[in-house]
A protein has these predicted regions:
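ATP-binding N-terminal substructure of ATP-dependent carboxylate-amine bond-forming enzymes
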Residues: 1-189, 209-211
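Active-site nucleotide/adenylate-binding loops and adjacent lid/helix of ATP-dependent enzymes
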Residues: 175-230
Length: 230
């Protein structure tokens, strides 16, 4: 999806930066306090290109991987809002709630809210949510006058960023504008800028011709080279 490659509008970026800046104080105040009131909005979206998603068998079930975050309900004043493409079987939810130490299933359910898009299509969950203003309104209503809240996502792209701005929530994750620095090329650039030793090599190679040239240049600079990792 090409939209995932486009930067957010300036106003959206500014709002997102404002939300993220406030998250630092929120994290320090409530994250490690088991008795602090807080709400976690879980968006378990596998946000990838639709063509790639269509090739992942049972991609919609990947949304169940973040059900481990239901363990947050062991903190008696923590609320969880969990959004999915399709409803999750109640038996699966019961299984997780029965794993909670020292908390009854009834007590946990009072602080757990599930909502679904009822949509099995091959677009990401986050895009499905963004296309449903009424669902966003329902989430906002649950959050209204509630404790401090943030979003927890499987991966963070411009779509999650847009949803965070729509909901007025910070994300426990990396700003998509900084994702490049987490790539192998970005990491090598940082190491070089900081004079950190890193294996000889090249970054930002885009095609087969670039790979061949990089390998040839590596060999020229080190005649004893026997192996290289692409």
């Amino acid at each position: 999806n090409n939209n995932m490659l486009h930067s957010a509008p300036r106003e959206e970026n500014e709002i997102f930066q404002f939300l993220q800046a406030g998250f630092t104080a929120l994290y320090e105040a409530v994250f490690h306090d088991k008795m602090a009131e807080k709400t976690v909005v879980v968006i378990p979206s596998l946000t990838l290109d639709p063509d790639i998603l269509s090739k992942v068998e049972g991609a919609v079930h990947y949304e169940e991987r973040l059900l481990c975050l239901l363990m947050l309900l062991r903190m008696p004043r923590t609320n969880v809002i969990y959004i999915t493409s399709n409803p999750i079987d109640p038996i699966i939810i019961d299984y997780y709630l029965h794993l909670l130490p020292g908390i009854t299933g009834h007590h946990a359910r009072q602080r757990l809210h599930f909502s679904s898009c009822y949509d099995s299509s091959n677009i990401s969950l986050t895009e499905k949510i963004l296309a449903r203003p009424r669902l966003i309104k329902r989430i906002k209503k649950i959050l209204q006058h509630g404790p401090p809240a943030h979003m927890a996502c499987f991966n963070v792209t411009e779509h999650e960023k847009k949803l965070a701005v729509e909901l007025g929530l910070p994300i426990y994750g990396c700003d998509p504008n900084l994702l490049y620095w987490g790539t192998k090329s970005g990491s090598r650039e940082i190491f070089k800028a900081c004079n950190v030793e890193t294996p000889a090599g090249y970054e930002n190679i885009k095609d087969e011709e670039g790979i061949i040239k990089a390998l040839a240049d590596l060999y020229k600079s080190n005649k004893g080279l026997k192996k290289a990792v692409v």
